[in-house]
């Protein structure tokens, strides 16, 4: 088998190929023009067919999609996608490709057997459906942020002239308030800016409506999302965002594995005679999943008296901030149970978790 490592850039791929003995056979750059890159992979497939094919390793970046698709097209046996490593003192593309190639070759047996590799932060490749759902929910989050930014700019114009108190309704997101904004008397430039902001606001609303319709449609085809939506305060967007970021639940052997995957478990830096003290959460994994779980805490605390009692107990000892993160972590473990056993949400969490939580708070 051959072991291919790729340092990917926009205009070229830096290639390093090793054989089964670890010897470097090829060390070169390949243009990303379609004819050049296809010629290279055609030749690689021909050379590797008689010796068991080839494996590939590359670092994750924002434009891996086409290369991963091409690797699959040309029969790559295993694609290892990893997080970028710490920058070396002497950094070149050839050195980076060589380091990736050595990492792949040294750990080739464990990777073939799907065993964990120490210090190898591997990125799980989602299915096509999950990748599309992740992209869809990310677009929805981005459009929501743009709409919020537009509303903040409108508020700034009103504050500039101390006009916010004249609004006919408490908030701006009503038909009556929008009609008032369209007829508001302002200076020429402020009026021009406000008109453009109102047009943007209308555009974001139309785009959000289209996105929400698509999310609701795809939710019906996603098994995990249909389970997650039974939680308090979970919308179609939140359930699809969380469900698509779980993927195959079998890759998480324990409930805590999902919490760790979403960066909700504490770091630990003990050395020598130092006391065993945990630090803040790692914040690795999906920031969008953590944001959604943080929003769900408020709804769960209103709806679930068992979780609320447990939260209040932690809050008295450690403060509200740590207590909220603890609830987020508990929600991640509850989601694991729900998806794995196909259970809908019930007060206190899943049956096993409900009994543990009730015993802890004395309910």
Predicted feature descriptions by range:
Residues 1-363:
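A detector of single, family-specific signature residues
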């Amino acid at each position: 088998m051959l072991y291919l490592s790729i340092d990917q850039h926009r205009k070229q791929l830096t290639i390093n190929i090793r054989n089964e003995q670890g010897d470097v056979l090829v060390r070169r750059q390949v243009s990303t023009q379609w004819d050049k890159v296809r010629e290279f992979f055609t030749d690689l497939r021909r050379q590797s067919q008689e010796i068991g094919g080839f494996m590939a390793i590359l670092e994750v970046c924002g434009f891996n999609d086409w290369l991963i698709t091409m690797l699959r097209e040309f029969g790559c046996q295993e694609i290892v996608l990893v997080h970028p490593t710490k920058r070396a003192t002497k950094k070149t593309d050839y050195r980076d490709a060589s380091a990736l190639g050595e990492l792949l070759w040294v750990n080739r047996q464990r990777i073939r057997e799907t065993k964990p590799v120490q210090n190898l932060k591997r990125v799980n490749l989602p299915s096509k459906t999950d990748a599309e759902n992740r992209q869809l929910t990310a677009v929805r989050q981005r459009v929501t942020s743009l709409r919020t930014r537009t509303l903040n700019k409108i508020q700034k114009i009103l504050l500039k002239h101390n006009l916010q108190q004249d609004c006919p309704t408490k908030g701006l997101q009503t038909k009556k308030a929008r009609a008032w904004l369209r007829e508001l008397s302002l200076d020429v430039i402020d009026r021009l800016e406000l008109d453009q902001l109102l047009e943007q606001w209308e555009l974001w609303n139309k785009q959000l409506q289209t996105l929400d319709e698509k999310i609701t449609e795809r939710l019906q085809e996603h098994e995990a999302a249909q389970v997650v939506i039974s939680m308090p305060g979970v919308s179609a967007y939140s359930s699809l965002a969380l469900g698509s970021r779980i993927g195959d639940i079998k890759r998480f052997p324990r409930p805590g594995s999902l919490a760790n995957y979403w960066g909700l478990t504490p770091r630990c830096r003990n050395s020598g005679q130092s006391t065993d003290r945990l630090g803040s959460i790692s914040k690795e994994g999906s920031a969008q999943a953590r944001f959604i779980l943080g929003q769900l805490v408020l709804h769960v605390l209103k709806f679930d008296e068992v979780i609320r009692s447990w939260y209040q107990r932690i809050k008295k000892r450690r403060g509200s901030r740590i207590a909220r993160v603890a609830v987020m972590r508990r929600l991640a473990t509850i989601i694991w149970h729900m998806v794995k056993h196909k259970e809908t949400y019930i007060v206190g969490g899943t049956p096993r978790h409900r009994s543990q939580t009730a015993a802890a708070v004395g309910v």
